[in-house]
Curated annotation (Swiss-Prot):
GO terms for biological process: IMP salvage; purine ribonucleotide interconversion. This is GMP reductase. Belongs to the IMPDH/GMPR family. GuaC type 1 subfamily. It comes from Escherichia coli (strain K12). NADP(+) binds at residues 108-131, 216-239. GO terms for molecular function: GMP reductase activity; identical protein binding; metal ion binding. PANTHER family: GMP REDUCTASE. The active site is at C186. Its EC number is 1.7.1.7. The keyword Lipoprotein does not apply. GO terms for cellular component: cytoplasm; cytosol; GMP reductase complex. The lineage of its organism: Bacteria, Pseudomonadati, Pseudomonadota, Gammaproteobacteria, Enterobacterales.
Length: 347
């Protein structure tokens, strides 16, 4: 047993210190970034935000809606090959370039992903997703995927420490997904005692990944556009959002009605709800590590997307960053004990 004494921080523990700026307007800020990925050699340009690969967020409808904002969607892994074919037939090349194909690590997952990728060469992203990215089996699967799809951009996770981030990049991942337990409907930290405050995880993993020419995506923990700005300020190349994009018309959750008001169900992918839906229930050897919540219907996702992008532009103007790429170089975090005046929060 050992204890690390240095304090680890989440997004709620800091604010970004304002700095002098020559920008005259938020409209002067360029949010689009251009990337060339280490292993695939592929280039991509767009706004580096990703809708999470949850079946109540990462839907085909969400992908179509967010593509118009130049935002990526990691489409969840529970669509059939036939459903993928129908989506591809009805989607433009511009939509498909904003899509990630998600997969687990079983042999069946691998074969299904291969079939999906063979449907259209415009599908250039693969998101290999497990709750615990520290297993040797996962690393081997990433290497297998890289060998099978040398020109596809592979995003793999989740991990929260630099050494594992390096391991995944060396095994073939272009982007490492960072985050264990920070999600709004994730209970891993409560059920297992395992986790890592998200901002510190982002800072440390970004440092490790960038040293090898890789990239990271901060996955989880964002509750406001300000948190998205903090993730980019901490060094994240991409930011993945789940709860912030849930509850919309495009989110795909089941709608329930209580006392005349409609709600949409949103649940973690390790929750009892998810496991009942996709694998018949919670296996006797494990515990559910997610929860189910009812969200008031939030309308089209376009309004939320505009709010997030507007907040990002404003954050950049406060620190004098004319491009999103400059935000991390212009960011100084200050530790705080409060984030906002909450006097009217319950009204």
């Amino acid at each position: 047993m050992r204890i690390e004494e240095d304090l680890k921080l989440g997004f709620k523990d800091v604010l970004i210190r304002p700095k002098r700026s020559t920008l005259k307007s938020r409209s002067d800020v360029e949010l689009e970034r251009q990337f060339t990925f280490k292993h695939s050699g592929q280039s991509w340009s767009g706004v580096p935000i990703i809708a999470a690969n949850m079946d109540t967020v990462g839907t085909f409808s969400m992908a179509s809606a967010l593509a118009s904002f130049d935002i990526l969607t990691a489409v969840h892994k529970h669509y059939s090959v036939e459903e993928w074919q129908a989506f591809i037939n009805n989607s433009s090349a511009d939509v498909l370039k904003h899509v990630m194909v998600s997969t687990g690590t079983s042999d069946a997952d691998f074969e299904k992903t291969k079939q999906i990728l063979d449907l259209n060469p415009a599908l250039n992203f693969v998101c290999i997703d497990v709750a615990n990215g520290y297993s040797e089996h996962f690393v081997q699967f990433v290497a297998k995927a890289r060998e099978a799809w040398p020109t596809k951009t592979i995003c793999a996770g989740n991990v929260v420490t630099g050494e594992m981030c390096e391991e995944l990049i060396l095994s073939g991942a272009d982007i490492v997904k960072v985050g264990i337990g920070p999600g709004s409907v994730c209970t891993t930290r409560v059920k297992t005692g395992v986790g890592y405050p998200q901002l510190s995880a982002v800072i440390e993993c970004a440092d490790a990944a960038h040293g090898l020419g890789g990239m990271i995506v901060s996955d989880g923990g964002c509750t406001t556009p300000g948190d998205v700005a903090k993730a980019f300020g901490g060094g994240a190349d991409f930011v993945m959002l789940g709860g912030m994009l849930a509850g919309h018309e495009e989110s795909g959750g089941r709608i329930v009605e209580e006392n005349g008001e409609k709600f949409m169900l949103f649940y973690g992918m390790s929750s009892e709800s998810a496991m009942k839906r996709h694998v018949g229930g919670v296996a006797e050897y494990r515990a559910a590590e997610g929860k189910t919540v009812k969200l008031p219907l939030r309308g089209p996702v376009e309004n939320t997307a505009r709010d997030i992008l507007g907040g990002l532009r404003s954050a950049c103007t406060y620190v004098g960053a004319s491009r999103l790429k400059e935000l991390t170089k212009r960011t100084t975090f200050i530790r705080v004990q409060e984030q906002e005046n909450r006097i009217f929060n319950n009204l």
